[in-house]
């Protein structure tokens, strides 16, 4: 029985899930965000975005002070009250942004792969790509443990590129709009498990978990959740989980924040 009163954590992707993919609107989800906040249920944002972007969005959504997962799990922003935890305020796993950038530049120069990273362009270009304001676009460039890029080569070359990255201890991950390179050991699932374990250690009881996402890069997160909402998305590959028991997994009919609301309506009324 899923109840808003029980110890509960909600993990949510942003673009295409809690935020509309085009307008970044989140208002359809606002009533549920208010209910969860009033019930002291943490909503933990989990995204490919930088921690700087996510802290801005966290404040806008009324979720400030809570932990969050940035850069597809390579960065964990700790909760404000977790100041005694080693690494406060952020835990960064694996290879740094600067080191990844060096690897990518070498691969591009020596093996002639075609791609454009966010480091190659200015904030005005990123604003044009994303529809963000220039000030928000500037926050997208503050990577700490990953690189975001647009792939401009063939599928065959992408397979070769992915293999080369794996050989170098890196992974190539598809997001809602862009591709991301990060340490092979990092992931939304590992970051979520760390946060769950921290809440369990602090409270003495493992919280029930509900995750929401819309893209292939959300699958690892949703796999480790007790309950999962797969929000109808734009990505042609979709999201496929090993365990799609309908008692555990709900696929929405609506997209973005409308689907986010639909998913919460389903689990809190159906259980």
Swiss-Prot record:
Active-site positions on this chain: 13
UniProt-listed Enzyme Commission number(s): 3.1.3.70
GO terms of molecular function: magnesium ion binding; mannosyl-3-phosphoglycerate phosphatase activity
Superkingdom of the source species: Bacteria
SUPFAM superfamilies, A to Z: HAD-like
Cofactor requirements of the protein: Mg(2+)
Pfam family, one: Hydrolase_3
GO biological process: mannosylglycerate biosynthetic process
InterPro entries: HAD-like_sf, HAD-SF-IIB-MPGP, HAD-SF_hydro_IIB, HAD_sf, MPG_Pase
CC per GO annotation: cytosol
Keyword terms, alphabetized: Cytoplasm, Hydrolase, Magnesium, Metal-binding
Subcellular locations according to the entry: Cytoplasm
Annotated residues for binding of Mg(2+): 13, 15, 214
Catalytic activity annotation: 2-O-(alpha-D-mannosyl)-3-phosphoglycerate + H2O = (2R)-2-O-(alpha-D-mannosyl)-glycerate + phosphate
NCBIfam families linked: HAD-SF-IIB, HAD-SF-IIB-MPGP, MPGP_rel, PRK03669.1
Similarity field: Belongs to the HAD-like hydrolase superfamily. MPGP family.
PANTHER family according to UniProt: HAD SUPERFAMILY HYDROLASE-LIKE, TYPE 3 (PTHR10000:SF8), PHOSPHOSERINE PHOSPHATASE (PTHR10000)
The protein's name in its UniProt record: Mannosyl-3-phosphoglycerate phosphatase
UniProt lineage: Bacteria, Pseudomonadati, Pseudomonadota, Gammaproteobacteria, Enterobacterales
């Amino acid at each position: 029985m899923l109840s808003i009163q029980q110890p509960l954590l909600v993990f949510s992707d942003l673009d295409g899930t809690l935020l509309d993919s085009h307008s970044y609107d989140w208002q359809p989800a606002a009533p549920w965000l208010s209910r969860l906040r009033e019930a002291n249920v943490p909503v933990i944002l989990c995204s490919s975005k930088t921690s700087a972007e996510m802290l801005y969005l966290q404040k806008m959504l009324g979720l400030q002070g809570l932990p969050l997962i940035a850069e597809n799990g390579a960065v964990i922003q700790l909760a404000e009250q977790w100041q005694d935890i080693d690494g406060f305020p952020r835990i960064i796993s694996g290879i740094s942004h600067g080191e990844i950038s060096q690897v990518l530049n070498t691969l591009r120069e020596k093996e002639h792969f075609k791609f454009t990273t966010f480091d190659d362009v200015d904030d005005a270009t990123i604003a044009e790509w994303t529809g963000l304001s220039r000030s928000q676009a500037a926050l997208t460039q503050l990577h700490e443990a990953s690189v975001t890029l647009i792939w401009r080569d063939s599928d065959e070359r992408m397979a070769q590129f992915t293999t080369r990255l794996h050989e170098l201890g890196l992974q190539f991950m598809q997001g809602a709009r862009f591709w991301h390179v990060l340490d092979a050991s990092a992931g939304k699932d590992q970051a979520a498990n760390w946060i769950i374990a921290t809440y369990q250690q602090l409270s003495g009881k493992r919280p029930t978990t509900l995750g929401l996402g819309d893209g292939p890069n959300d699958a690892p997160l949703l796999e480790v959740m007790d309950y999962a909402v797969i929000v109808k998305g734009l990505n042609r590959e979709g999201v496929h989980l090993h365990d799609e028991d309908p008692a555990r997994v709900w696929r929405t009919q609506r997209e973005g924040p409308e689907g986010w609301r639909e998913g919460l309506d389903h689990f809190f009324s159906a259980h």
